[in-house]
Amino acid sequence: MEKVETKLHLPALKKPSGSLVVKKDDKPIKTFNIASVQKQGALGNVLKGDSIKQKMQKEQQAHKGLDLVLMGDLTGSMSAYHAILKRKFTEICTTLFQLIPNLRIGIIFYLDHGSGDPYITKVQPLTVNVEQLQSFILGTPDGYGGDEDEAVEDALHDALEMNWSEINTHSVVLFGDARPHEVSACPYQHDYFKITESLFKKQVTINTVYCSAGCDYRRQSTLYEVEIGNFSRRVSRLGNPEFFSWIANVTGGIAIGVEQIDDIVDIIKGMAAKDAGKIDELEKEELKITLRPIPALVHIKEQAKLIEHKKKLLGYK
């Protein structure tokens, strides 16, 4: 773009002799570059746009909460955990809703295919209505389960269709004792590997609780180690505990085992607080009640620090 000079064109002056003398205007009053002016204007618009964007981001952060989905196996071997959840759910809600701003809770229960059970999955969408959640837990029956594998893949598919908020953090706590079916064994051809990858892309973190007697909760995360977000190598036919380890590790969650059935309550609260960034606050509140550290909560806190470090190294926010 060429430079444009603006000059004053002064009128001609008369000499005493009557002839005209044109006043030279060889000193430009102002020189400016049109491209430069346009660039500055565009820059101003960009800065203004960035300022609006930053304000919107701050506004979103101020209202950011947690979408927590409890996903549980209710087949026969898991009935004791369902009983605990029925009995302790009000306590869980009281703690979490006081601790975590803008919290919503959803529930997905699953059984198995073709085993005469009353359902394959039952879904309660994310809500703040505690009475509705409690009614869902009390009103959903246990089942029996058919083969060794359970309909985990169907529950994961339901999680993909959950009414997630665009603003909130997305967290799943999956508790069970059996792996999903492979694609060929699922009547609906649900592929748990691809569904898990899709959930990860939707920024859903899957924390797992492997429910088996005598399980060392500290070792669960080491049973199948994989980088966060690494879906380059397909997994299949993993053992039950290895599956629960893999799906947590690959989505940036925590895998933990249960030593005693009652531990499930502390673990659910700990996982939710961890994903909401409220683990320290929960620890303080629990210490007031128990007067001693809760081992599962201490472990979750330690694992959360390691995962955050990994995420930073991998470039995840």
Task: State what each model feature region is.
Residues 2-317:
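Divalent cation-coordinating acidic motifs and surrounding scaffolds
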